[in-house]
Swiss-Prot record:
One of its GO terms (biological process) is lipid A biosynthetic process. UDP-alpha-D-glucuronate binds at residues 397, 402, 436-437, 464, 495, 529-538, 616. This is Bifunctional polymyxin resistance protein ArnA. PANTHER family: BIFUNCTIONAL POLYMYXIN RESISTANCE PROTEIN ARNA, UDP-D-APIOSE_UDP-D-XYLOSE SYNTHASE 2.
Length: 664
């Protein structure tokens, strides 16, 4: 009885994988591939053509994870599902269609170089070895247990094309050895990946080929060979023109010249941060001829002493203008402080108060107006038109208000913010919108994933969900506008904490976050109230960690955050509200100001309805997946919960002491 397989494949490696399955006697039930993109230079073999030659059914669905395709694949009842350089992630329901295993062939020695374009990245980074890995597919990309690997050496003269040929041959050898064993045994031993060694690299774009002459010559040489033909090439501006470098060599000397200075034109040799680069081949502009380095020097008029500079770079660089509505709020004031530490930003902010930003108002690149977003619409529209990036941070985000003032929550959080989003559409401005972990509602996933987790809320009579659905609806509106060209990023904070989170006065009327309420009880000597026993778990994130992630989203290196949703939370800092209260108490008792406050009055368990009123409903856990944050902005949180609690407690105790001083 033959072994049945469904194959997802593209590129040369896809052809190699499919041919290896045929050679090993597998029955190919169906093949899924991609239609070639006319904008992409097609230098590789065609899976579709190979299928046609063998009479194999081939498909190119836009979404292979669509229930219709999953159902069809399930009916095929494959023993195995294989993925060979297929460019879309296969979901759990699709992978479950394989009776024995779902396996992927990845072009690196996992766990290193997970992600996109590993052959290019290993060259960029100057590696001397890579390889191919056959591994089990799991929900996370390239993270499943390893079935087989084959190593490939990288020579100093390898380019992306020659290395791809080596990887293609290695893949053929590995599959020739592995596939017959797999068919005979049904399973092969698999070794879990060592997560401590894992690295992830994202998609490369033509813009990544920009040459920075301040870097060492060896680093630039590695970039050039990583993106030379058939890829778009490494390039640099020369005056108003573009020089694409196809081939080069390294000279260890720079003759003492500044980076970017032409040392000679025969050969064309340019000083770098360390050493110099000899350009041996390239072209002028995207449609120019392939020329030698010496002819390029003549084409561009380069002589010894010339500077490889972009005219635009010679002019002063304008700071990025960032509009923050709700600048006095918890995120707004911390974000402003962080961006002002970087001289690349100019902040324009509006809020109805200014107590949290007084420390920033004297800074030359900080501009503040006191105002209400529902009233000062002309000022807002003008500044959206004027600025580059817009962050509408104004919202009611305290749970008691969801049941106490649901219409006000909807009016402010949805209606007023929708106006701002539409101004961003009108003036083609990038919007970075604060979604919320609340949108996941009662999702049952162990870790909430931005792209796959269902957003589940309670019945209409549970009004606490009005905040969640207001935010979710705006997320969906922004996403829809994004399909029509709006530049956006949605970020979802998971229980950020730190100084200036709230005010004790807000806690006194119940309109604050959980930790502020707990601290107020300690300050006033009243029992700490644990709603429904405090068993609910949350993942608490230090505001310093959170703001660093947000700053990277604003920076948006290589446009990686465009059109993305990014959870910003710390899954390692999960604690129940009771545990939060207990740690607060421990640090409170040890604090130098402890003697100024009443004795601890104990914990008291209360029902949620008596605390929040009718219409409240809670969730047991809220744990983020931060894979998107890791791969898109290279972010992982690092501050432990106990440190965050200590900083937050200290801030509020000092606020309480200041209140006492004012009353004297």
């Amino acid at each position: 009885m033959s072994t049945k397989a469904v194959v997802f494949a593209y590129h040369d490696i896809g052809c190699v994988g499919l041919q290896a399955l045929l050679d090993a006697g597998y029955e190919i039930a169906a093949v899924f591939t991609h239609a070639d993109d006319p904008r992409e230079k097609t230098f590789f073999g065609s899976v579709a053509q190979l299928c046609a030659r063998h009479g194999i059914a081939v498909h190119a669905p836009e979404d292979p994870n669509h229930p219709l395709w999953v159902e069809r694949i399930g009916k095929l009842a494959p023993d195995f599902i294989f993925s060979f350089y297929y460019r879309q992630l296969l979901g759990d329901s699709l992978l479950a269609c394989a009776k024995k295993a779902a396996l992927n062939l990845h072009g690196s020695l996992l766990p290193r170089y997970r992600g996109r374009a590993p052959a290019n990245w290993v060259l960029v980074n100057g590696e001397s070895e890579t390889g191919v890995t056959l591994h089990q597919m799991v929900k996370r990309a390239d993270a499943g247990p390893i079935v087989a690997q084959q190593r490939v050496s990288i020579s100093a003269t390898d380019t992306a094309l020659t290395l791809h040929g080596k990887l293609r041959d290695a893949a053929a050898d590995l599959l020739c050895e592995t596939l017959p064993l797999l068919a005979a045994q049904g399973q092969l031993p698999a070794t879990p990946q060592d997560e401590s060694r894992a690295t992830y690299f994202g998609r490369r774009t033509p813009a990544d080929g920009l040459i920075d002459w301040s870097l060492p010559a060896t680093q630039l040489y590695n970039l050039i060979r990583a993106v030379t033909q058939p890829y778009p090439g490494a390039f640099c501006p020369v005056g108003d023109n573009k020089l694409i470098v196809w081939a080069a060599s390294v000279d260890t000397s720079s003759n003492g010249e500044a980076p970017g200075t032409v040392i000679s034109h025969e050969p064309l040799r340019i000083a770098c941060g360390e050493g110099s680069l000899v350009i041996t081949a390239g072209q002028r502009g995207d449609n120019g001829l392939y020329l030698s380095g010496e002819q390029l020097a003549r084409e561009f008029g380069l002589v010894a002493g010339s500077q490889m500079l972009d005219k635009a770079k010679r002019r002063s660089v304008r700071r990025t203008r960032v509009l923050i509505l709700g600048v006095n709020g918890f995120i707004g004031n911390h974000l402003s402080e962080r961006l002002l530490q970087d001289d690349r930003y100019e902040i324009y902010g509006m809020d109805i108060g200014s107590d949290a930003i007084e420390r920033l108002r004297a800074k030359p690149n900080f501009h503040f107006i006191e105002g209400d977003i529902s009233i000062h619409t002309e000022w807002i529209e003008y500044h959206i038109k004027k600025c580059d990036v817009v962050l509408p941070l104004v919202a009611i985000a305290t749970p008691i208000e969801y049941t106490r003032n649901p219409l006000r929550v909807f009016e402010l959080d949805f209606e007023e913010n929708l106006k701002i989003v539409r101004y961003c559409v009108k003036y083609n401005k990038r919007v970075i919108f604060p979604s919320t972990s609340e949108v996941y509602g009662m999702c049952q996933d162990a870790n909430f994933n931005e792209d796959t987790s269902n957003l589940i809320v309670g019945p209409i009579n549970k009004q606490r969900w009005i905040y969640s659905v207001s935010k979710q609806l705006l997320d969906r509106v922004i996403w829809a506008y994004g399909q029509k060209g709006l530049q956006f990023t949605l970020f979802r904070p998971f229980n950020w904490m730190g100084p200036r989170l709230d005010r004790l006065d807000s806690a006194r009327i119940g309109s604050s976050r959980a930790i502020t309420q707990l601290i107020l009880h300690l300050v006033e000597g009243t029992p700490i109230r644990l709603v429904d026993g405090g068993a609910q778990k949350r993942c608490f994130t230090d505001v310093v960690d959170g703001i660093e992630a947000l700053a990277r989203i604003i920076e948006n290196r290589d446009g990686r955050c465009n059109g993305q949703i990014i959870n910003i939370g710390n899954p390692d800092n999960e604690a129940s509200i009771r545990q939060l209260g207990e740690e607060l108490l421990r640090q409170f008792e040890a604090h130098p100001l402890r003697g100024h406050f009443p004795p601890f009055a104990g914990f008291r368990e209360v029902e949620s309805q008596s605390f929040y009123g009718k219409g409240y409903q809670d969730v047991s856990h809220r744990t983020p997946s931060i894979d998107n944050a890791k791969k898109l902005i290279g972010w992982t949180p690092g501050i432990e919960l106990s440190e965050t609690i200590g900083k937050t407690l200290d801030f509020f105790l000092r606020e309480a002491m200041a209140e006492k001083a004012d009353q004297c």
